[in-house]
Amino acid sequence: MSLTHRDVATVGIGGPVGSGKTSLLTALVPELRDQGLDVGVIANDILTQEDADVLRERFAGVVPEDLVAGVETGACPHTGIREDPSMNLQQIDSFLADHPELDLVLVESGGDNLAATFNPELADYSLYVISVAEGEDIPRKRGPGVVDCDLLVVNKTDLAPHVGADLDVMEHDANEVRDGPVVFTNCKDETNIDTVLSHVRDGVLFA
């Protein structure tokens, strides 16, 4: 895989509000650090630094504080990751100016609809996270975020019996609408986080 014009691999994580993007980051980043990788994290939001502040606290002692940044898009979340990713690209440049040793930057989108996708100048590899609680029918709605991402993550599998979602149906529908891999996760107990990690490493670091 050819990377963006920057000398660092970039992974975009998108998905609706409440799907578990921040929880997935929380699970992935310490594992990446344990494997000896230098990681930066960018959290996009419309008007606040809320997610970035949460991640700085969670990654204290794991990731240097200046490698966790918030980008306030001031507009629809997809604008900052697709139509005009300049603020995110500038933040990556800022990371690299102070930390040229960086191996990987993870970019979390603000919560958005099923149409959100990443500009290829921003993300070498993209994950799209949906939650079981959003409804069993989400995969078959064929949103570009679901269909076009490199890896679809179906999160919060522990909630399936409580919301009447059939995971087998979701898996079947997801495989019907997309050619890429699908992983079912529960970030609370880190079910299949290792599988997500393997896809990220194989898809962007060792491609």
UniProtKB/Swiss-Prot annotation:
Keywords: Chaperone, Cytoplasm, GTP-binding, Nickel insertion, Nucleotide-binding, Plasmid
Classification of source organism: Archaea, Methanobacteriati, Methanobacteriota, Stenosarchaea group, Halobacteria
Protein name, UniProt field: Urease accessory protein UreG
Binding-site positions, GTP: 15-22
GO MF annotations in UniProt: GTP binding; GTPase activity; nickel cation binding
Role played: Facilitates the functional incorporation of the urease nickel metallocenter. This process requires GTP hydrolysis, probably effectuated by UreG.
Alphabetical GO biological process terms: urea catabolic process
Keyword Protein biosynthesis appears in the UniProt entry: no
